[in-house]
C-alpha cells in the first residue's frame, strides 16, 4: 500500500474491463482518475457515457491526453494493436503503462524494454490480472518439473478475438522453461480434422474454447502412469481482475524496467 496519490488515465474505459477499472479508481483513495482515452466522445465526461460519478474528461488523441493531464500511469485495456501503440506512446511521454492487452511479440517487448531503460520508468504487461490465474501459472510451472506430459485448455467468452489466450500462451512459455521439449501425444498420430489436436507450443498442446456464458477459465492437465493432475482457475466476473490491476498500478511506480507477467511481481 502507498499513500502517494497516483494519477491514472484509463484507455478502454467504456469496455467491460474498463468499466471495472473506473470503479477501482473511484474506490481507491490514493488513485485519481484524470482522464479516459476513447475512439469517440471527445470533450465529453465519463459520466456522460457510462454509469459513473467520474467527471474525468474523454480524449481521442493520446498525445494530447498525456500532455494535458500529466498522469503517472496509463491503464490500457483496449485491443492488441491499439495497446501496442498506447504503450509506446505512454513511455515516450514518461508515463508508466499498465497493460492488460496481449499480442506483444518478442521484438515488441525488446523495443519497450529499451524505452523503459531510456526513460528510467517501469512498464507492466499482464496477460492476466487475476491473482488466482497467476498462481495457477506458477503452480503449473512447478508441476512441469515432475510431469512432462501436459496439455492446456483455455476457455473464454465468444467475444474474445485472440486465440490462444495470452494466459494460455504465457502458461505454455513458463512450462517450456523447465520442461524438456517433447511433442505431446503419439508420434504417429494423425488429425482426421485439421487442428483437432490444438495449437502446438514446443510440443505442448493448447486448446481454445469460445462459448457464451463464459468469462475466463483455464485447465492445465498433467498425466503420468497411474495418475493425473489438473490445475484449474475460473474467473466468474471481471471484478476478479481488479486486484491485479491495483497491484500493478502501485508496483509500476517503484520499478524502472519492463515486467511481462504478474507472476514477476507476486512473491
From Swiss-Prot:
Keywords: Amino-acid biosynthesis, Cytoplasm, Diaminopimelate biosynthesis, Lysine biosynthesis, NAD, NADP, Oxidoreductase. (S)-2,3,4,5-tetrahydrodipicolinate binds at residues 157, 166-167. The keyword Cytoplasm applies. It is an enzyme of class 1 (oxidoreductase). Its EC number is 1.17.1.8. GO terms for cellular component: cytosol. Disulfide bonds: none annotated. NAD(+) binds at residues 12-17, 38, 100-102, 126-129. SUPFAM superfamilies: Glyceraldehyde-3-phosphate dehydrogenase-like, C-terminal domain (SSF55347), NAD(P)-binding Rossmann-fold domains (SSF51735). It catalyses: (S)-2,3,4,5-tetrahydrodipicolinate + NAD(+) + H2O = (2S,4S)-4-hydroxy-2,3,4,5-tetrahydrodipicolinate + NADH + H(+); (S)-2,3,4,5-tetrahydrodipicolinate + NADP(+) + H2O = (2S,4S)-4-hydroxy-2,3,4,5-tetrahydrodipicolinate + NADPH + H(+). It is found in: Cytoplasm. The keyword Cytoplasm applies. Catalyzes the conversion of 4-hydroxy-tetrahydrodipicolinate (HTPA) to tetrahydrodipicolinate. HAMAP family: DapB. This is 4-hydroxy-tetrahydrodipicolinate reductase. The gene is dapB.
Amino acid at each position: 500500500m502507498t499513500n502517494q496519490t497516483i494519477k491514472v488515465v484509463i484507455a478502454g474505459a467504456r469496455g467491460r474491463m474498463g468499466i471495472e477499472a473506473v470503479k477501482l479508481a473511484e474506490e481507491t483513495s490514493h488513485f485519481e482518475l484524470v482522464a479516459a482515452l476513447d475512439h469517440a466522445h471527445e470533450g465529453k465526461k465519463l459520466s456522460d457515457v457510462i454509469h459513473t460519478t467520474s467527471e474525468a474528461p474523454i480524449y481521442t488523441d493520446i498525445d494530447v491526453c498525456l500532455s494535458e493531464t500529466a498522469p503517472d500511469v496509463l491503464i490500457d485495456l483496449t485491443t492488441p494493436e491499439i495497446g501496442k501503440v498506447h504503450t509506446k506512446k505512454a513511455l515516450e511521454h514518461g508515463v508508466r503503462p499498465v497493460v492488460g492487452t496481449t499480442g506483444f511479440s518478442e521484438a515488441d517487448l525488446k523495443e519497450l524494454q529499451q524505452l523503459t531503460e531510456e526513460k528510467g520508468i517501469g512498464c507492466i504487461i499482464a496477460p492476466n490480472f487475476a491473482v488466482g490465474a497467476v498462481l495457477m501459472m506458477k503452480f503449473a510451472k512447478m508441476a512441469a518439473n515432475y510431469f512432462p506430459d501436459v496439455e492446456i485448455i483455455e476457455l473464454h467468452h465468444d467475444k474474445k478475438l485472440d486465440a490462444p489466450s495470452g494466459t494460455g500462451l504465457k502458461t505454455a512459455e513458463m512450462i517450456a522453461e523447465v520442461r524438456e521439449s517433447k511433442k505431446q501425444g503419439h508420434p504417429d498420430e494423425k488429425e482426421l480434422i485439421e487442428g483437432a489436436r490444438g495449437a502446438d507450443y514446443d510440443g505442448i498442446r493448447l486448446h481454445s474454447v469460445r462459448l457464451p456464458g463464459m468469462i475466463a477459465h483455464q485447465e492445465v492437465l498433467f498425466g503420468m502412469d497411474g495418475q493425473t493432475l489438473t490445475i484449474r482457475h475460473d474467473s466468474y466476473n471481471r471484478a476478479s481482475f481488479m486486484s491485479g490491476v491495483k497491484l500493478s498500478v502501485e508496483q509500476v511506480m517503484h520499478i524502472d524496467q519492463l515486467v511481462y507477467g504478474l507472476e514477476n511481481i507476486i512473491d
